[in-house]
């Protein structure tokens, strides 16, 4: 009986230590992210706040599947109303093109986070089925050009590389 109690006490101690160790590791990881690069944490929050740039991901995916990059002449009609605010736009938010949704999302993101959030969106599109090298290049090139397409002031085009993973 004493051996059984000793075994259970030892097992309980190991479980308690493992639980405390796991919790401490998670907390330290999150703190390290914010301390080493506070901008990265802020941009991650911006990305989540703006529904992970859903409209931008739709636009990027559509362009990559079509094998097109960025913005072309046939998109001119799509961008005519891009500058309209939601309340001025005759179409409801459900009917807006993914490009218009994307531009509206990007205008709401902090200027310092536009490129990091676009890179994150492009990475998610890439992970959701864009596997060919050409498709991956289209995904990241389209994402880089979106600030120009949406006429986001002071951003221009983003300078990031295609992520292999």
UniProtKB/Swiss-Prot annotation:
InterPro entries attached to this UniProt entry: Bifun_inhib/LTP/seed_sf, Bifunc_inhib/LTP/seed_store, Napin/2SS/CON
Example GO BP: pollen development
Top-level taxon: Eukaryota
Signal peptide location: 1-20
MF annotations from Gene Ontology: nutrient reservoir activity
Keywords of the record: Disulfide bond, Seed storage protein, Signal, Storage protein
Residues that make up the propeptide removed upon maturation: 21-37, 71-89
Pfam families from the UniProt entry: Tryp_alpha_amyl
Similarity comment text for this entry: Belongs to the 2S seed storage albumins family.
Subunit structure: The mature protein consists of a small and a large chain linked by disulfide bonds.
Function: This is a 2S seed storage protein.
Name by which UniProt lists this protein: 2S seed storage protein 5
Species the sequence originates in: Arabidopsis thaliana
Species lineage: Eukaryota, Viridiplantae, Streptophyta, Embryophyta, Tracheophyta
Encoding gene, per UniProt annotation: SESA5
